[in-house]
Amino acid sequence: MFCVQCEQTIRTPAGNGCSYAQGMCGKTAETSDLQDLLIAALQGLSAWAVKAREYGIINHDVDNFAPRAFFSTLTNVNFDSPRIVGYAREAIALREALKAQCLSVDANAHCDNPMADLQLVSDDLGELQRQAAEFTPNKDKAAIGENILGLRLLCLYGLKGAAAYMEHAHVLGQYDNDIYAQYHKIMAWLGTWPADMNALLECAMEIGQMNFKVMSILDAGETTKYGHPTPTQVNVKATEGKCILISGHDLKDLYNLLEQTEGTGVNVYTHGEMLPAHGYPELRKFKHLVGNYGSGWQNQQVEFARFPGPIVMTSNCIIDPTVGSYDDRIWTRSIVGWPGVSHLEGDDFGPVIAQAQQMAGFPYSEIPHLITVGFGRQTLLGTADTLIDLVSREKLRHIFLVGGCDGARGERNYFTDFATSVPDDCLILTLACGKYRFNKLEFGDIEGLPRLVDAGQCNDAYSAIILAVTLAEKLGCGVNDLPLSLVLSWFEQKAIVILLTLLSLGVKNIVTGPTAPGFFTPDLLAILNEKFGLRSVTTVEEDMKQLLSA
């Protein structure tokens, strides 16, 4: 096992990465190794997808499957070894079908990629795990060095984050052939074990630029189906009655659940990154969507244990449900998996609803505590002139984007302390689950404009980018000249690709933490600092002083 993709990875003087029987996330060595094997199979599939496009062949089954299967290897998504192997087998079957299509056009069709003809050696998980050793990401570290390995992983993990957003967009009916062609090209190239530093740096920026397009179609999918988010108050306390909790990012799953629970007497609560759903008109119209439950994903083993109903995980993040003894009432959807947990293959939530009706639910309603969400792209753009007016009248000094992933590390209190230290004449724009560090606090307003503005899920960084570009255009300056600072927390691969997206768009002087990714070497950090001004957090006082004086 070697895995260094998330922020909680093991760090020692000898090197970074989880390399024992189990990773810090709870992923076993077996599952981790089989995920490496799956990635190799997906690289071979992408290699043939690139070749097929040379012949004018676009196989939508391949395009739909590849990012989804890659998403299953993201942190805290799928811990179920047999399902990972199932994805690998499906990848190879699709590859062979695509290969046959190519050969029907050109009998000499050939794909020159190390992964192009990969076959699984056995049905036995132990044998497959031994085969997976050929594809361990750091297998040639001694030959290529830490810097090249770090750049490879930056590209692989960044592309993995983009694949997750591609799957979210696909679920909502969005497709862009150029994006998929670019995805397959990059995925196939990474399967050649590239070792050119400049080429890898260019690839990282290409992934960021591609992801900007992905976030654009995801935004289109969400707003076309569910309307543009508008500011909405959400209760974060319990309401009397039977209940279901839904977590993750999949708004379509939430919509289906709301439709199927309507009139059943079962209330629905959002959790984690599903909180922004309350801002969408077509979702909040359901009166039994009564609130949001819990805090950051890392607290779920305590909070889920206390929730008196079933729980549905639609995407990341799931952690060991046996710890809180709620494994008999947590359900996984789509690419999510945990051994022994009930999995929903389709869109029928009937078994979940039946379980909710058999459980006690909340015995009484607590005193409501309301927070505000729903500052989506359209709403944010509607504030642009107000923001400019406040700045011109010196009522608004600075905007801080404080957001990103949450996690268990104690150093993440930095982001709570930073938000509460922001001066009263400054605004906080937030997104993703990092907001749970401070989103239940009171920040007041500036002439009626809330000082805490919740833009949505992690992918809604797109909305923040569009706002920044719009402000810069209206003010006749560059984005980096705005009174705007980005203070980002990271945990997993979606955050990595958001960072690459920002860097590829030329956004500079981003402050990130609580620690640097374990695959970043001192040399790579120095390169990113020199090119983009990217740096790690220090202390709240020092960072605040520096950002306000920039």
UniProtKB/Swiss-Prot annotation:
Gene Ontology MF terms: 2 iron, 2 sulfur cluster binding; hydroxylamine reductase activity; metal ion binding; peroxidase activity
EC number(s) reported in the record: 1.7.99.1
Cysteine persulfide carried by residues: C405
GO CC term, one of those recorded: cytoplasm
InterPro entries from the UniProt entry: HCP/CODH, Hydroxylam_reduct, Prismane-like_a/b-sand, Prismane-like_sf, Prismane_a-bundle
Keyword check for Iron: yes
Pfam families linked: Prismane
Claim: Metal-binding is one of the keywords in the record: yes
Reaction catalyzed: A + NH4(+) + H2O = hydroxylamine + AH2 + H(+)
Bound cofactor: record note: Binds 1 [2Fe-2S] cluster. Binds 1 hybrid [4Fe-2O-2S] cluster.
CDD domains attached to this UniProt entry: HCP
Binding residues for hybrid [4Fe-2O-2S] cluster: H249, E273, C317, C405, C433, C458, E492, K494
Enzymatic class: oxidoreductase
Gene Ontology biological process: response to hydrogen peroxide
Entry keywords, A to Z: 2Fe-2S, Cytoplasm, Iron, Iron-sulfur, Metal-binding, Oxidoreductase
Cofactor requirement: [2Fe-2S] cluster; hybrid [4Fe-2O-2S] cluster
Binding positions ([2Fe-2S] cluster): C3, C6, C18, C25
Subcellular location: Cytoplasm
Annotated family: Belongs to the HCP family.
Function in brief: Catalyzes the reduction of hydroxylamine to form NH(3) and H(2)O.
Protein name stated in the entry: Hydroxylamine reductase
Species: Salmonella dublin (strain CT_02021853)
Name of the coding gene: hcp
